[in-house]
Every structure is written in C-alpha cells, then in structure tokens.
Amino acid sequence: MYENPILQDNINKLMKFGYEFIKPASGRLACGDSGAGKLQDTNFITQVIESMLYDKKDLKGKKVLVTAGPTMEDIDPVRYITNRSSGKMGYSIAEEARDRGAEVTLVSGPTSLEMPFGVQFVGVRTNEEMLNAVLEKFDKQDIVIKAAAVSDYKPKAYSQKKIKKNEDELSLPMIKD
C-alpha cells in the first residue's frame, strides 16, 4: 500500500506544499505482506514532533559528538566488569543538540535506551572501542561532550577460558585503563 505510485504522488504533492511526513516502519503488515507501511513507534513519533516544534536552532550547522553509557571490560568469555551507568544524560544531551539543529553523533556503550531519532549512532562495548570511535570522528566535530562512564580499570589479564569455580575466593588483579 505505502509503495503504491498514487499514494507516493500524493505524498510528494503535499511535501511540495510544506507538509512533513514521518515515514512508516517496515515489517509484517496487516495484509500479511512485509515492507514499509507499519505505524512507527509512538516514542519515535513523539521525538520527531518535538524536534520539529523546537524553535531554538542555535546549533544549526554545528557537528556535535556525544559519548554516553558504560563500557565493559572482559574478564573471561562469559564475565565482564562494568558500571551501572544508564546513559540517560548522554542520550538527553544528544537529543537536545539535535533539537537545536546540530548534526549529532552519539557514541554509546551498551544501554537499554532507545536510539534517538535523527542522530548518527555508533555502538561500542569497551574503552578501546569508544576511544577509537571518538578519535575517528573527533577532527570533524565542532563540539565534543564526554558524558560516558568509561571504566577506570580493566583486568590485568584476560582468561581465554571461563574461570572455574574451584576456589572460595577469586583474586582479580586490575590495571588502570
């Protein structure tokens, strides 16, 4: 239905008059087919509308890089050390910069947050991955905001195999990262 040429012509005509559209999501449709035509998530729709209604565009033309969330450092193939950072502050900063007209890149460690609309997202896991992602984009940015909760320490040695539970205690030497 969404791909129908008549519908697309009508959408294009309305866009020429200044109307804006939120493109549909893709997936399994009510008719049983798959493709574009599903209603977008309501949080996504809310973000798009808020961004359109935001009057203050003082960051228009600026490139902003924001880091967010925690990083994880592996101990063995099944365990890691991290912190409880939710990433909310970094994501909120990225959304605000986007709403104010900036071209935003969000470099984020693992979080349960939804990826913000209209933001270039780079997902990372470790300190090293975050550093490399930031350095790759750094020179092209006007503003860099470091809101991530990067791990301060990492295990001195990574165990290639899962550490067995043979002992009552485990000593885990750490080094500054």
Residue ranges and their predicted role:
Residues M1-Y2, L29-D33, I75-D76, M115:
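A short acidic, helix-capping loop that chelates divalent metal ions and anchors anionic groups
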Residues G27, G69-E73, A148-K156:
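Short glycine-rich anion-binding loops that position phosphate/pyrophosphate groups of nucleotides
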Residues A25-A30, P70-D76, K161-N166:
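Gly-rich Lys/Arg/Thr-decorated short loops/hinges at beta-loop-alpha junctions or inter-strand turns
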Residues P110, G118-D177:
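A glycine- and small/hydrophobic-rich beta-loop-beta segment
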Residues T46-K63:
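Flexible nucleotide-interacting loop at or near the entrance of a catalytic core
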Residues F21-P24, L106-V107, K146-A147:
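General beta-strand structural signal in soluble alpha/beta enzymes
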Residues M1-S26, A36-I49:
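Short, glycine-/small-residue-rich phosphate/pyrophosphate-handling segment
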Residues L7-Q8, N12-K16, D58-T126, L172:
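Glycine-rich phosphate/diphosphate-binding loop of Rossmann-like nucleotide-binding domains
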